[in-house]
Every structure is written in C-alpha cells, then in structure tokens.
C-alpha cells in the first residue's frame, strides 16, 4: 500500500503537482487526521496524515491523480460543553475542496449526534471531494476595471436569469454557459449594465426542513463548499469550472464585470440539530462562535456563525476570496450578512478579516460590497464599514418607496437619499459610490410586486406566511394582486417609472434587480428563497418591452450626466446640483420639512428632473431657458417648453436645456 510522505503545510486543500497530490487540513484541536481516498469501486483506503506543522495537518500521496475522490475523518474529543464535536465515524468535506461528488440529502447518517455521538459510519452515502487540476487558457482576458462612478449593477440568479429564455439553446438554459451566450451578453450591453452580480455560485445544500417539504434552497445562501462551484448550474459537473470561466471571459470581452455574492457568515451545518458536513467535525471550536454552554451564537439566523476573528478562519476566508479572483477572474464580491466579518465579537472596522483584505494585493483591488448588518445586537452597521467597501443602502430603498408609494417622506429626507446619503457615507474618505442604491433586491418584493401588493403572500414557502418581512413600504394602488382596470395598470406603471427614475438618476451606485425591467412578479412572495420554479424564473416571453426600453433609456441618460458619473460629493455652488421648488426657487427650510411633494433637481446645470409627487395635476415653473423633454420621457417630437410643465399627479419628467 502506498505510504504518505509528509508533504507541505501550504497551500490549503488538495493540490496536484504532476507527480502526486499534497493534502492539508487545519485543525487546532484534533488528535489525529485520516485522509480517506476512494477508488473507482468505492473502496475506501485510509492514511494518517503524517505531517503536523502548528495546527496544519498535511501529507503527500505519490502517484495520485486529478479525479481522485477523498474526504477526512478527524479524531478528537467529544466534549459538547467545550464546543468539541469530533466523530471519526463521519466522512468530512475538505473546506477547500474545489469539486464535490455526491448530493447533500437529508439522511440521519449525515448527523454527528447532539448530546451523544452517532457512531454509525456514513462513508457509503457521504459526498466526496474531488481532486482537480487547474489548466485554463484565459487568452488575453483582462478585468474591465470599471470605475466605481460608472458602475451599474444587475443582480441576477444564474438559473432564473436564463432558464426560460427562448433565444438561448435549450441545453444550456439556466447554466453558467448561458451567462456567456451572445444573446445574454447583448441584452446586458443594450440595457447598459456594467456589472453582473450573481447570487451564490459556491456549492450549497438544501436545508433538511426544506427537503422534507419537497422544496429546495433556490437562492444558495446555505454554503457547504466555498471553493467549489454549485454543480447544478453546469452542463456537466466535471466541466463546471471551465464553463464558469468561459462565461466570465465572454462577459469581460464585452466590458462587463462579474461580482459574486458570497456567504462568509455561516455554513449549511446549521444549528446543533443540523447535518455534519465539514467544519463542525474538523474543528468546531475554531470555526464557529461558541457560547459558554457549547452551543452556537446564532448571529445569522441560520443556526451558526463563522468566527472570522480566528486567525485560521481568516486565512481560510482570505484564501477562498483569492481563489475566486485568481482562478476565476471575478471582479468583486457582495458579502452576505457582512457585519459578521467585523465581529470580534463586537463589530470593528479593524477586525482581522477586514485588515487581511486591506493588506492583500489581490483583494484590495477588487470591488467589495457589504450587506452591512446581521441579526445580533449591534448588528446594524450601515455606513460603518472600512473605506474599501461599498454598502447596500437600505436608507435609499425605504426612502424611495415611502416617497412614491406612501407619500409620507419630507423633501429633505428624499433629497438626502438622492444625494448618496452623504450623512451616512461621507466619512473616512469614502466617495458617493460607497452607497449601493437599490429599490428592490432578491430578498423582498420585486418592483412590480411593490405596486401590486400591500401584504406578503409567502404561503408557498410552507411557513404559514410567517417568513419574510412585513416592512415593505408597498402600495397596491387599491387592489391586491396583479391585473385590474386600465386606470389601475397605468397608475402602477407611473409608480414603477418614478421608482426606476429615482434609482437610476440618483447619486451613488445603482443596483437593478434582474426582471424589474421586465415587470417580473413573484405574485407577492417577498422571500422566494425556496421557490425554484416559474415564480422566480424570468419569463422572457411575458416581458414588457416598453418597460425594458424605459429602463435602458434611463441608464444611458445617467451616463450623460457628469454630476452622476464623476463620483464626487456635491457641494453647494459647485454646479453639480441645485434643489428648486415648483417655482424654480431655492427651497426654504419649511419647504424642505413640510412643503408639498414637488421638487426640481437640476444636475450639471443642463439636466432637470421635475417631480410632482402629489395627487393633483400641478404647474411646475421651470428654470430660465429653453427645455425639452428627453427619452424616455418623450418621443422624437419634443416640444420646447420655456416656462411651465403641467406635472401629472404622481409624475415626473426629465428635461435637457
């Protein structure tokens, strides 16, 4: 039987050098680590890792080749009160595995035990890691390096974006390949998108609870192997990595960046009753935040929380991020529940992972976007992330909806959000682009549902409509649900136009949810995380071409306005912005706080956004000069307006002088 050589303690994971494979695994509390390899017949062969450098266990298997399936058995104490849950009867996934063979099914054998260990062996059904070799021809690929001030983000799901697209070949719909198909790329270019932000593509598992209900995790925020691509989005699991890189290369050639939504806050092992896949059995005490009683701190709402202040876990997370940049050429990350990244356990801007990213010559050069909260006390950290990060701006989302759909936001508050929320983000040398403005996202109502539903309708999720937020700031315009009279449809359309205009012509970095430009509806489901079906897949055959054209025209208009593209804070008198009332005069203090919802925003002294958010037709006196409405607010025959715009109720228009 082949013997393992000691090998090297770096890099993490399994790496083929042409002669064999080097294996490394971190565990500070293990007493012994077995490498388990499986031949073509499924026969298991076990080897003790002979090397032990600090907390890294390692060994080298001569003559091993790519395609080898493997896992680990980790020996150590079973002491739940101290946070130790070692169980060598369970085969474990390498946290740095780059490919997984097998499915993460709901099976009692994939549990370690709660108070007492479950010593039933699970190697026959446990997923296995696969050794991969990294040879890929990137040709002349180069990152687009789109300046932040010019960035337009499009948030999309790999499958949902293309699964029903009639012009994409059936055999690749819903896959990585479809992202790089010319039809998809041409669409994104025509729309004006500069960055495609993908919901999680790292391998994830469906929670046992969902599997028992016949559902699955659709969004992907339940990670199990952070270095491995989710195989369900590939035409073939064996070629997933190349399919993904082909798509990125094609998008880059079109000048479109790729941003990955990544989940560095919890794992699919969930709470103590959850499955055992990897980290819990490798070194539970190090990988997770553990309470004094040995249970998990659940600061994520998912049962566990990664301890990203532990040096080894910081190294793991940093290596993961570098892998996606260096191996797949991704251009940035959106971090789910990113406040966890800064916990020590208190949130700190100089937390170890933040410091590691800032000091890394690779990671410090890509786009970094935080979802700036978690669910723990002190978890709401909007505006408090380090300068390298942009942040989701929920202030903007709520303000835009309240102003246009609830009519209860003063002009001053609306203007503050329109101006990149400088009260929140203008600190530590940050620029307006640090504010990622959004009206909708994957989590919550779609834009169409914002104007069609007053209440969530999440019954299909199997939780009796308890899940999902109740704070939607939506307005059904008088009738719950889709459809209605022509007048109702037109009023809803006007609200959609107003919200899109606010999003795409405001200062900051706009993020558009895929499908909003089509009029996509999830029929009132504002938490469709487990709906892998036509509720979430974009139906291109039903897309509103008029709304798509309206959205594209807004994006292209944005790119013509210097005040929005220069990424500089607006200052009084700098010519970037003037705020005027309905009479084209500067607003008084009282008008800012108590005035009617009528406002004129003059950008770069040439572009005028006239707003009448009241319920009555109102005359808006335009500033001096000859003005004409511009697309998407007027057709080819634009009359010159020299004095007054008859502002329709709940309407707005953009003019150019």
UniProtKB/Swiss-Prot annotation:
What keywords tag this UniProt record?
A: Carbohydrate metabolism, Glycogen metabolism, Glycosidase, Hydrolase
Q: Which cysteines are joined by disulfide bonds?
A: none
Q: Does the keyword Ligase apply?
A: no
Taxonomically, the superkingdom here is Bacteria
Ribonucleoprotein is among the record's keywords: no
Q: In which pathway does it act?
A: Glycan degradation; glycogen degradation
Q: Which residues cross the membrane?
A: none
* Positions of the record's site feature: Transition state stabilizer: 443
Q: Which interval of the chain is the signal sequence?
A: none
- Give the family this protein belongs to, as stated in its UniProt record: Belongs to the glycosyl hydrolase 13 family.
Q: Which NCBIfam families match?
A: glgX_debranch, PRK03705.1
Which protein is depicted?
Glycogen debranching enzyme
> Which organism is this protein's natural source?
Escherichia coli O1:K1 / APEC
Its ancestry begins with:
Bacteria, Pseudomonadati, Pseudomonadota, Gammaproteobacteria, Enterobacterales
């Amino acid at each position: 039987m082949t013997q393992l050589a000691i090998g090297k303690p770096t890099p993490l994971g399994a790496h083929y050098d042409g002669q064999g494979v080097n294996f490394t695994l971190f565990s500070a509390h293990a007493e012994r680590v077995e490498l388990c390899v499986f031949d073509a017949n499924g026969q298991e062969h076990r080897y003790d890792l002979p090397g032990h450098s600090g907390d890294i266990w390692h060994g080298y298997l001569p003559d091993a080749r790519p395609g080898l399936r493997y896992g680990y058995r980790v020996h150590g104490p079973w002491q739940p009160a101290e946070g130790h849950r070692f169980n060598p009867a369970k085969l474990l996934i390498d946290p740095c595995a780059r490919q997984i063979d097998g499915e993460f099914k709901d099976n009692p054998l994939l549990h370690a035990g709660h108070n007492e260990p479950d010593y039933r062996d699970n190697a026959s059904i446990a997923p296995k890691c696969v050794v991969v070799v990294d040879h890929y021809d990137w040709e002349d690929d180069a990152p687009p390096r789109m300046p932040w001030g010019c960035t337009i983000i499009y948030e999309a799901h790999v499958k949902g974006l293309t699964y029903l697209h009639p012009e994409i070949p059936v055999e690749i719909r819903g896959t990585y390949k479809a992202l790089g198909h010319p039809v998809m790329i041409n669409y994104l270019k025509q729309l004006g998108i500069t960055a495609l932000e993908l919901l999680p593509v790292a391998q994830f598992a469906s929670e046992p609870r969902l599997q028992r209900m016949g559902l699955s995790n659709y969004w992907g925020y339940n990670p199990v192997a952070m270095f491995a691509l989710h195989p369900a989005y590939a035409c073939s699991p064996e070629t997933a990595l190349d399919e993904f890189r082909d798509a990125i290369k094609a998008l880059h050639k079109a000048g479109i960046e790729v941003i990955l939504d990544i989940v560095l806050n919890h794992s699919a092992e969930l709470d103590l009753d959850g499955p055992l896949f990897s980290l819990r059995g490798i070194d539970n005490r190090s990988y997770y935040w553990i309470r004094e009683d040995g249970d998990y701190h659940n600061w994520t709402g998912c049962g566990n929380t990664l301890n990203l202040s532990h040096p080894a876990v910081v190294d793991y997370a940093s290596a993961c991020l570098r892998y996606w940049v260096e191996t797949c050429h991704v251009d940035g990350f959106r971090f789910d529940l990113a406040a966890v990244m800064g916990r020590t356990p208190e949130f700190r801007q100089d937390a170890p992972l933040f410091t590691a990213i800032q000091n890394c010559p690779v990671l410090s050069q890509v786009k970094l976007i935080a979802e700036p909260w978690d669910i723990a006390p002190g978890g709401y950290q909007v505006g408090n992330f380090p300068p390298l990060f942009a942040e989701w701006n929920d202030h903007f989302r709520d303000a835009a909806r309240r102003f246009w759909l609830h009519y209860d936001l003063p002009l001053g508050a609306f203007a503050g959000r329109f101006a990149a929320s400088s009260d929140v983000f203008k600190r530590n040398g940050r620029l307006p682009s640090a504010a990622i403005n959004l009206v909708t996202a994957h989590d919550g109502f779609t834009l169409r549902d914002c104007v069609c539903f007053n209440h969530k309708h999440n019954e299909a999720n199997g939780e009796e409509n308890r899940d999902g937020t109740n704070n939607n700031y939506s307005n059904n315009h008088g009738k719950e649900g889709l459809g209605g009279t022509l007048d109702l449809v037109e009023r809803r359309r006007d609200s959609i136009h107003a919200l899109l205009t606010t999003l795409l012509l405001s200062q900051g970095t706009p993020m558009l949810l895929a499908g909003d430009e089509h009029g996509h509806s999830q029929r009132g489901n504002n938490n469709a995380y487990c709906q892998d079906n036509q509720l979430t897949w974009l139906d291109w055959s039903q897309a509103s071409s008029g709304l798509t054209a309206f959205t594209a025209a807004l994006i292209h208009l944005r790119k013509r306005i210097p005040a929005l593209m220069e990424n500089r804070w607006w200052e009084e008198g700098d010519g970037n912005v003037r705020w005027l009332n309905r009479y084209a005069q500067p607003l008084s203090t009282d008008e800012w706080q108590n005035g009617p919802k009528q406002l004129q925003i003059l950008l770069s002294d040439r572009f005028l956004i006239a707003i009448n958010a009241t319920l009555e037709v109102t005359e808006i006196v335009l500033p001096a000069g000859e003005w004409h409405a511009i697309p998407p607010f007027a057709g080819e025959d634009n009359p010159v307006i020299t004095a007054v715009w008859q502002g329709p109720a709940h309407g707005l228009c953009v003019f150019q002088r």
